[in-house]
Amino acid sequence: MPRTDNDTWDLSTSVGATATMVAAARAIATNADNPLIEDRFAEPLVRAVGVDFFTRWVTGDLVAADVDDHDSGWKLEHMPVAMAARTRFFDSFFQGATQAGIRQAVILASGLDARAYRLAWPAGTTVFEIDQPQVIEFKTATLAKLGATPQATLRTVAVDLRDDWPKALVEAGFDKGQPTAWIAEGLFGYLPPEAQDRLLDNITALSADGSRLACEAIPDMSEVDTEKAQEMMRRATAKWREHGFDLEFGDLGYQGERNDVAVYLDGLGWRSVGVPMSQLLADAGLEAIPQTNDSVSVADTIYYSSVLAK
């Protein structure tokens, strides 16, 4: 079902199901030989959501070869490796920010992100998680049942990012006078182009000098045949439906020309360094993800780390 302006979801439907998919990939990456990341909460969270397809994937009852289209460049097989590299990037970002003295962190569209519970935060750090109310409530309750304890002061902000989230964040205790470490992981593709700009504007308005931002930017799709790319995605996930999971991924994102993230942030006073997923994989000693000519692949995604100078 196509997105609407006021649509909502839980972790088994729409955009929320992609958060569960990513957590499942983190769980598999965690359980790999010589794992690059360690997220012990990923698998129990996926199990608690209860989407059978992803539960079977993390337990090994379903393997990527069962559902992947071998002629497609987009495969479930690539997800654990890609999410391991992505997770490592954002984990390292927070580590660097806290080493620089930042003690306030914000995770936008936090989904099943358990960094507040699994990272070693310095004393005095406050972590804010922002997401839809159903998502926040489920994850918080599930982690409490697991006996998990936040490793920092955790403040959850149950608000849709299309609503007045800056007000809700400040009301939750956010201090605009303190430098902040922000992450927007796997978020921009689910926002219309103008909403992406508005989000960056709001982050800047809330950020003190020396704040940092890490984000995942959508590649330039101007040369991509959108209909052809969506058909490729439908083919890639056809066997998912045969195994009981039916989600039209092409309906979840927003098309349209976007401002280049680094250029836009530069205009707001941020200085950015970008690294493509292909480089993150190479730096971690992981196998490259094949690229195709008819669509934008995971390997094209750019990861930016930015610092604000006001």
Curated annotation (Swiss-Prot):
Molecular function, one GO term: methyltransferase activity
InterPro entries from the UniProt entry: Ppm1/Ppm2/Tcmp, SAM-dependent_MTases_sf, SAM_mthyl_Trfase_ML2640-like
Superkingdom, natural source: Bacteria
A Pfam family of this chain: LCM
Record has Transferase as a keyword: yes
Gene Ontology biological process terms from the UniProt entry: methylation
Record keyword Transport present: no
E.C. no: 2.1.1.-
Keyword terms: Methyltransferase, S-adenosyl-L-methionine, Transferase
Enzyme class: transferase
Binding site for S-adenosyl-L-methionine: 131, 160-161
Family according to the record: Belongs to the UPF0677 family.
Physiological role: Exhibits S-adenosyl-L-methionine-dependent methyltransferase activity.
Name the UniProt record assigns to this protein: Putative S-adenosyl-L-methionine-dependent methyltransferase MAV_2110
Organism listed in the record: Mycobacterium avium (strain 104)
